[in-house]
Amino acid sequence: MHKVTKFAIRHLSDKASRFVPKAGVYPKGYAVGGIHCGVKKDGKSLDLAILQNTFGKNASAAGVFTVNKFKAAPVQVSKKILKEKSGSGINSFVINSGNANAVTGAQGMKDAEDMVLVTDSVLENPTNSSLVMSTGVIGNNLPIDKILGGIPKLASQHLGNTHQHWIDCATAICTTDTFPKLVTKRFSIGDDTYTLAGLCKGAGMICPNMATLLGFFVTDAPVTPSALQQILKYAVDRSFNSITVDGDMSTNDTIVAMANGAAGGEVIDNTSSCAERYSRLQAEIVDFAQQLAQLVVRDGEGATKFITIRVKDALSYKDAKSIASSIANSSLFKTAMYGKDANWGRILCAIGYADVTSANSVIPEKTSVKFVPVDGSEHLNLLVNGEPEQVDEERASEILQNEDLIVEINLGTNGGQSADFWTCDLSHEYVTINGDYRS
């Protein structure tokens, strides 16, 4: 019986504990776990994780990575392995937290490669069958001896497929997170039933492009590497690329997926003959990725609000997303939300400088803005067809007292395209957390 280690993370507040599942459904053919190996200095917090395909057949894998020019060593190593293997035969992920192994020169590259080498050896994988990820402080070399010594211990004693194993794994990738982020779901495609499990970390340095944070999806569905890559990229664009906490893009952002086919059924590919099954899987993964991405925003450093920016009736999806992103990243808007101030001028300002595709993408005389409560109560119009409304400040205050809020913008272009973007407010606590990050 492999051991489980009760997760060591900051004491969960009542707010945080709401988002940690008490149970889950998990895909067939995987073993996961996490331990403390010594990267984190407190002597107990979990800081090393492994996800392993145990099905006995090579899995398909896909990845989406940061476009930050200072790509961390593990990002470079994982991208290279994924490309060389064409997404086939990747059977494990190994992750450390507490140190990003970013901007660490030749030694950092060697350390990332050694993590892959040792993981493949102890799991009896062929060479370059593992992807490696790191997260934490930038600019310091890894305590690599502790990590390389921890990998065999984790692999031999602490991997399994119970709920606690998954919680340990999700906790071991955390840094400033206040809770481990884990989501599972079961779904059917035709007569076949499949399961998805996903975990991610992130609370600050969140403003992605191509991917964000660290995130892992695993499924027992049979999917070709090329189909998995296309689905992952599509899903990430509509989830992890549609969130922001503070406008900073990490050097280490990585989202990876693995599909081992352990549940059987017809292989899902991206050919026309498989279009229906492909579309069904894509829809499930998009919904799943959005659930995980939203947990990151809910755990935004110092955040007190979860805000959905919903842009409707844009000329294109690109315009809708760009405008939503512009609002979501506005520090003035985010601080107004923290202060419960219905300052809609900051919303219009962010709409006005958004990077859109044409002069007709935003027409002030057709633009409307409103606050939409999530409890189903009456919305509050702020701007209607370019004309300001007399705002009921008491009603605005009632709405802004809530943790969740939708800000809806209708561009009135008759283009019919829409996009959602998720963000949080910006508080005094955010400054405190990041001012003390290395201390």
UniProtKB/Swiss-Prot annotation:
Site (Involved in the stabilization of negative charge on the oxyanion by the formation of the oxyanion hole) at: 135-136
Q: Which residues form the active site?
A: 212 (nucleophile)
* Sites annotated Cleavage: 211-212
Cellular component GO terms held in the UniProt record: mitochondrial matrix
**Origin, by domain of life?**
Eukaryota
Q: Which compartments is it annotated to reside in?
A: Mitochondrion matrix
Q: What class of enzyme is it?
A: transferase
Q: How is it modified after translation?
A: The alpha and beta chains are autoproteolytically processed from a single precursor protein within the mitochondrion.
| MF term (GO), any | L-glutamate N-acetyltransferase activity
Its family? Belongs to the ArgJ family.
* UniProt function note: Catalyzes two activities which are involved in the cyclic version of arginine biosynthesis: the synthesis of acetylglutamate from glutamate and acetyl-CoA, and of ornithine by transacetylation between acetylornithine and glutamate.
Return the protein name: Arginine biosynthesis bifunctional protein ArgJ, mitochondrial
Q: Which organism is it from?
A: Candida albicans (strain WO-1)
